[in-house]
UniProtKB/Swiss-Prot annotation:
<keyword id="KW-0460">Magnesium</keyword>
<keyword id="KW-0378">Hydrolase</keyword>
<dbReference type="InterPro" id="IPR036702">
    <property type="entry name" value="ComB-like_sf"/>
</dbReference>
<comment type="similarity">
    <text>Belongs to the ComB family.</text>
</comment>
<dbReference type="GO" id="GO:0000287">
    <property type="term" value="F:magnesium ion binding"/>
</dbReference>
<dbReference type="GO" id="GO:0050532">
    <property type="term" value="F:2-phosphosulfolactate phosphatase activity"/>
</dbReference>
<dbReference type="GO" id="GO:0050545">
    <property type="term" value="F:sulfopyruvate decarboxylase activity"/>
</dbReference>
<dbReference type="InterPro" id="IPR005238">
    <property type="entry name" value="ComB-like"/>
</dbReference>
<protein>
    <recommendedName>
        <fullName>Probable 2-phosphosulfolactate phosphatase</fullName>
        <ecNumber>3.1.3.71</ecNumber>
    </recommendedName>
</protein>
<dbReference type="Pfam" id="PF04029">
    <property type="entry name" value="2-ph_phosp"/>
</dbReference>
Amino acid sequence: MKLFVYHTPELTPKDQVPDCAIAVDVLRATSTIATVLSAGGEAVQVFSDLDELIAVSETWPPQKRLRAGERGGGKVAGFELGNSPLDCTPELVEGRRLFISTTNGTRALKRVQDSATVLTAAFINRAAVVQYLLEKQPETVWIVGSGWEGSYSLEDTACAGAIAHSVVEKSQLPPEKLAGNDEVISAIALYSQWQDNLLGLLHHASHGQRLLRLECHEDLKYCSQTDVLTVLPIQQEAGVFKTKN
């Protein structure tokens, strides 16, 4: 197994797909996806385009769907939800499909959707992702950060490092044996520096500061937790994520 970390979807190799792709958008799309599925959501379907989301979701009965839209950190007008995982309570999401489009996370998912296996990861479900990698041993693994509008994201790289760090620990292989690129080593180093203060890291991150200005303090606290959910979101068909059975 070789791990590759890419800070943004745009940095992934063109005309290639890995055996397993892991999309990361800690703040907040992949944290929300894990939360919805853990709370009993039927599935999460991701879209880059809001008009396409609306058109597809209209084919579902209103009582079986929820629409979540975020642009620039704020909720899209006319949608039931923005991109806060804390709004995704079991009472609201159980048995329903969440149709979601966000500024960054859905773009990363679209880039890797043709991979043989596509997972979503955040700090909150890191252990489930690591367990899958250790059990299945895919030959090539891309961990793709969503970034922010095409640029580097501190929190996504730290989460990639958290995954790689745990794989190294549990496999007892040296990092250089698992690392397919230098970004893996730097991501592990970043996580190692901040692993005891991930909330502090999120506060330093530019997108974390953006969310603090929007008074999303509790979202940052929630998203900074590690291994609190056992759910593994896995793509069942293009853009549709369900829990692994």
